[in-house]
Amino acid sequence: MHLKFHTLSLNDSGPLLAESSVKPSQQQICDDILLLWREEPITDGLSVDLLYDKVMGRHPEWILDRTEFKNAVRNQHLDSNDERSLKVYNDFIDIPSFNDDYDAIIDKKTSSNVCVKNCKDGHKGRGLYALKDFVKDDLIFKESYPIVVVPSMERLTLMKMGKACSLCGGLLSHLSKHFIVVHSLDCDNCGGVWCSNECKNIDIGHNTLKHLHKSKINGIDSVAWGKFEKYCNDNVFVAAYSIGVIMALALIDKKNTDKIRKKFNLLSSVSQGIRINESDSTNIGGTFDASSGAMSNKDPEPIWKTSYELLKNAIPTTDELDMETYLSYIGRYNINQISDQMFFLPSLINHNCEPNVRFEVVSNKEIRVYARKNISAGQELLTNYINPLHGVKLRRRELRVNYGFLCHCDRCIKEIKRNNDVENENLSNSINNNGGLSVPNDSLLTRRKSSMRTARPDLSELLKTGQEFDLDIPENLSGKKNRRTSVRFVNQVTLAVEE
């Protein structure tokens, strides 16, 4: 029995308006392919011809012949198995070598079960290793705070209104005004409110950064800082804002200045300019810095320059901060951040598409690292930098664009071989007019789905530890990220029917 997929409109959906014919750019083609791979991971292994049919089924308004489509795919390296043709920038990444500085700043109370040392694979630099055996779901270690706690930029407006914690950004709807006043959780000089005494006590930058002062406090111009913060917020430039907060807190928190700077400088670094040059796509189907509020501007340099000048005005004492150093800080943030925060030890954990650890971030402040499977003493801890549900092409592309390297883990090699085998068998699948995928060869599709189930993490486990995969963040009409994860409701349903 052969099945094919039909896509039908729901009863209560209105008729679709006919769209004018358009000629898509190579960028649009690339973005739609990437979006398709995100929405339907099984299409990751389609041949170029079947991929063309699928994309054209999604965009009947496009004027695009098969040759133009193949050229776009080839130019963007979307179907290339020749690694020599793929751009990577791992050689440009500065990875500080292992030295005694790591041990000196590791909190032995919460991180005594791990150590930092150089990896056997020289390309990976240093890594984090287990000092004892762990069984699945064991807590390996935790970090109570990131290098500095960076307030959630997407909630800055709510913070000013006293509706979200001035430090962690947690919503305050569960706290009564009486409770806030009795426990002195409100600021005497502004509308800021904290969710707990813990957040209030560690928010030592609040007075300097949130209150206007006639003169510089701790070497920081509060008026200029407000302009820098507003510019970053308006342009969804999370990386620049985070770097600014880290630099400011390194000046304000004099007790921990050396520790803050040492932790920051021990993290891997690469210029954001290099990363931009090596990326192929930054629009809705793109993957570049998607987890940290990527800017879709074709020319980000004006935003870099303006934010740099505003930061220099806010912190005039940073004489050593030239434009190239600033861009290296931006790149450092983007390749190390976890949930918009820079945690030290977790940033040292290397990638594998079949990881043995998982993260749990609590209230933007604490991160806990658990064993995903049994781990032996001396074994390297490995995490997944990208969405584990994606197919091998999209996974490797996301790693290449965001982190500068191609993954050669066992899972990737296995899936690449499987895709090549499927393509070599010249599947006779075809795409119907509605964009559905007909499946005349049940055994091949069953084998592909079976191998996908085997290779990917258990879905129940992913749902239990939902920090490890994200809903895509859509863009609004202006092209800027709105930073709010959304669910898209569609007016169509797909079902399988017998031919």
Swiss-Prot record:
Broadest EC class? transferase
Do you know which Pfam families this protein is assigned to? Answer: SET (PF00856)
Its name, as the record gives it, is: Histone-lysine N-methyltransferase SET5
Tell me a GO cellular component: nucleus
Function description? Histone methyltransferase that monomethylates 'Lys-5', 'Lys-8' and 'Lys-12' of histone H4 (H4K5me1, H4K8me1 and H4K12me1, respectively), thereby controlling gene expression and remodeling chromatin structures.
Tell me the domain of life.
Answer: Eukaryota
Q: Which family does it belong to?
A: Belongs to the class V-like SAM-binding methyltransferase superfamily. Histone-lysine methyltransferase family. SET5 subfamily.
Which reactions are catalysed by this chain? Answer: L-lysyl-[histone] + S-adenosyl-L-methionine = N(6)-methyl-L-lysyl-[histone] + S-adenosyl-L-homocysteine + H(+)
Location in the cell reads: Nucleus; Chromosome; Cytoplasm
Key words, A-Z:
Chromosome, Cytoplasm, Methyltransferase, Nucleus, S-adenosyl-L-methionine, Transferase
Which gene is the coding source of this polypeptide chain?
SET5
Annotated Gene Ontology MF terms?
Answer: histone H4K20 methyltransferase activity
EC code(s) of this entry: 2.1.1.-
Q: Which PANTHER family match?
A: HISTONE-LYSINE N-TRIMETHYLTRANSFERASE SMYD5, SET AND MYND DOMAIN-CONTAINING PROTEIN 5
Sequence ranges assigned to domain SET in this UniProt record:
112-386
Which PROSITE patterns does the annotation name? SET (PS50280)
Tell me yes or no: is Nuclease among this UniProt entry's keywords.
no
Q: What's one GO BP annotation on this UniProt entry?
A: telomere maintenance
| Disulphide bonds in the chain | none
What InterPro entries does this protein's entry cite? SET_dom, SET_dom_sf
User: Which CDD domains does UniProt cross-reference here?
Assistant: SET_SMYD
